[in-house]
């Protein structure tokens, strides 16, 4: 369900904060997007994926972060997104989270989410690549930042990690120098 509130009651925001329901909320140029908790399949895939990709990223000198961790437009207070995972150079770290140019953002699809609407924003803050995964089919799409726009690329080779992603027999297969994992 999509709802638009012209004015959000402070009590609602405080209740969401108190119950921990605001962790994945996003601020799109000052407009609050209240995001529900992801379904179980989404969370399970995200956890398994992070266990595989985080050590690879760390070995390449990248920070590994997962939801709820914010990606912020540098220098702007009310403009951030909360991807499922992101991998970024250490210099992108701030007290708020990651500022701008993450090397890779991972978005795991949920019903009625706004993954594809975020692509232009990710490009505008300098994200290098966005990996989109369907948790039901394990289908993967990779978008790369080309001159400030996210464009689909193939085959799915995550350049910043040196990882190939493909769907094999209903599983997400990740292959890298020295390893393979089926999720």
Residue ranges with predicted function:
Residues 1-8, 14-18, 22, 33, ...:
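C-terminal interaction segment
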């Amino acid at each position: 369900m999509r709802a638009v509130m012209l004015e959000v009651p402070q009590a609602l925001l405080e209740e969401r904060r108190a119950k921990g329901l605001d962790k994945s909320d996003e601020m799109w140029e000052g407009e609050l997007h209240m995001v529900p908790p992801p379904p179980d399949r989404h969370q399970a895939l995200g956890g398994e994926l992070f266990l595989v990709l985080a050590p690879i990223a760390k070995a390449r000198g990248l920070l590994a972060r997962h939801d709820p961790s914010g990606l912020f437009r540098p220098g702007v207070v009310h403009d951030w997104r909360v991807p499922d995972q992101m991998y970024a150079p250490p210099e992108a770290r701030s007290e708020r989270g990651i500022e701008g140019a993450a090397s890779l953002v991972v978005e795991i699809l949920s019903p009625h989410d706004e993954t594809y609407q975020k692509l232009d924003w990710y490009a505008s803050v300098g994200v290098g690549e966005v990996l989109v995964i369907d948790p039901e089919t394990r289908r993967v799409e990779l978008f790369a930042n080309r001159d400030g726009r996210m464009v689909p690329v193939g085959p799915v080779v995550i350049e910043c990690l040196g990882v190939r992603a493909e769907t094999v027999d209903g599983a997400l297969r990740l292959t890298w120098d020295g390893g393979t994992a089926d999720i």
